[in-house]
């Protein structure tokens, strides 16, 4: 498969605007234009090639890369979103609930702020801990937004929204959203507005009560320089990197994952495909000598695998989150006693692992396992204890 320009599914929703048509080259009758699904294998809106063929019917397993093979659904969906009015206050379920109740993946997502009007912002999580009863009462008496954290935003910022986090995009935001391949949304507040049928849009309060994390939300950002650009968000479902080109940039061959590049500013080319602001291109896994030329920037979406690497020596436990290309995402360490007991070492390995995961917005289920290099005596059977403390994660010792 060659590098291909992508043609998105276009969505008209009542809160949409006209910026994607005016400034990002989208040609569609959809009015207002709320979303363009730049990379989508989802049945509700398939991304196509120039001849109208869905990408999902053309791309082979080899084109997608080996990192996609372990998923029951293609894992990621990339959108551009133009909010001319507030989106509903909503929440998305995690995988376990979504698979049981919706036969779908859940939805963890990431927002890269492409543009924002003065005063624009987002609602993201609760200001303080709430009980489920307090949450339900706030929905009933229409005071929910009083409890939500409003964050003013500006272009270039990035926000990671784990499944179960209540949120809403507000008017004046133009966003590149990288998310799990899911279209499941539970609305809990919609400002009383009516849809095209003249009726208030459906709410999904009971399901939202099941899945919403009502604890105080603390936003975390990720800005990690890599060979390709600046890493902005990671999960087992997607890796999003801000890529800037000023001249020429060669992409290394990647057998493990496709790449999808969404141009958010400037113009140039990706291989033999000319691009400008608003365009997305698909680069198949294993493609050699993909050259980016011009002056532009955007988000590169791939699928990576992540590991916790732990190194024990006589005075410390050092840990890293590492991807399958050997890129170190974050690192940390805990100082230990020279003759620490095994149980203490096990506890500290678990503490350090959780600390590393938290810094990356990762959960245990997002990583492939813990790899331990041990330069002091630690009973190998303790791998079972480490695994149990970390929720069943695979633990291996180097050279075992």
Segments predicted by a language model, with ranges:
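Short acidic-glycine-tyrosine-enriched beta hairpin
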Residues: 148-160, 271-289
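Acidic/His-leaning functional-site neighborhoods
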Residues: 221-275, 279, 286-287
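His/acidic/aromatic-lined binding-pocket segments of jelly-roll/cupin-type domains
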Residues: 78-79, 87, 109-112, 150-151, ...
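Short glycine-rich, Thr/Ser-proximal phosphate-binding strand/loop in the N-terminal lobe
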Residues: 306-344
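Transition-metal
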Residues: 1-130, 185, 190-219, 240, ...
């Amino acid at each position: 498969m060659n590098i291909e320009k992508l043609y998105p599914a276009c969505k008209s929703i009542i809160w949409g605007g006209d910026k994607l048509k005016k400034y990002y080259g989208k040609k569609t009758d959809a009015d207002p234009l709320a979303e363009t699904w730049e990379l989508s294998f989802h049945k509700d809106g398939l991304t196509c090639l120039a001849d109208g063929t869905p990408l999902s019917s053309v791309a082979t397993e080899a084109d997608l890369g080996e990192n996609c093979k372990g998923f029951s659904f293609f894992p990621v969906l990339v959108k551009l979103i133009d909010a001319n009015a507030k989106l509903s206050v909503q929440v998305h379920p995690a995988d376990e609930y979504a698979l049981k109740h919706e036969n779908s993946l859940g939805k963890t997502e990431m927002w890269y702020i492409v543009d924002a009007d003065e005063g624009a912002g987002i609602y993201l999580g609760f200001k303080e801990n709430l009980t489920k009863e307090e949450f339900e009462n706030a929905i009933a008496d229409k005071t929910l937004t009083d409890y939500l954290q409003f964050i003013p935003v500006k272009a270039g910022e990035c926000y990671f929204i784990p499944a179960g986090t209540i949120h809403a995009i507000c008017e004046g935001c133009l966003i590149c959203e990288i998310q799990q391949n899911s279209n499941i949304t539970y609305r809990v507040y919609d400002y009383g507005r009516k849809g095209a049928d003249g009726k208030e849009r459906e709410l999904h309060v009971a399901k939202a009560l099941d899945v919403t994390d009502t604890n105080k939300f603390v936003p975390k950002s990720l800005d990690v320089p890599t060979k390709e650009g600046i890493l902005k968000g990671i999960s087992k479902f997607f890796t999003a990197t801000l890529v800037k080109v000023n001249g020429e940039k060669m992409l290394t061959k990647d057998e493990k994952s496709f790449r999808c590049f969404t141009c958010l500013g400037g113009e140039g080319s990706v291989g033999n495909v000319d691009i400008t602001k608003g365009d997305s291109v698909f680069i198949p896994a294993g493609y050699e000598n993909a050259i980016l030329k011009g002056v532009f920037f955007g988000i590169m979406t791939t699928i990576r695998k992540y590991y916790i690497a732990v190194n024990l020596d006589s005075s410390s436990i050092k840990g890293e989150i590492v991807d399958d290309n050997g890129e170190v995402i974050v690192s940390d360490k805990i100082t230990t006693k020279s003759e620490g007991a095994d149980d203490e070492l096990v506890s500290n390995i678990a503490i350090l692992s959780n600390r590393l995961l938290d810094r990356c917005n990762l959960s245990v289920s997002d990583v492939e396992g813990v790899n331990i290099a041990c330069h002091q005596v630690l009973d190998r059977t303790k791998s079972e204890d480490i695994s149990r403390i970390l929720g069943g994660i695979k633990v291996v010792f180097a050279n075992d």
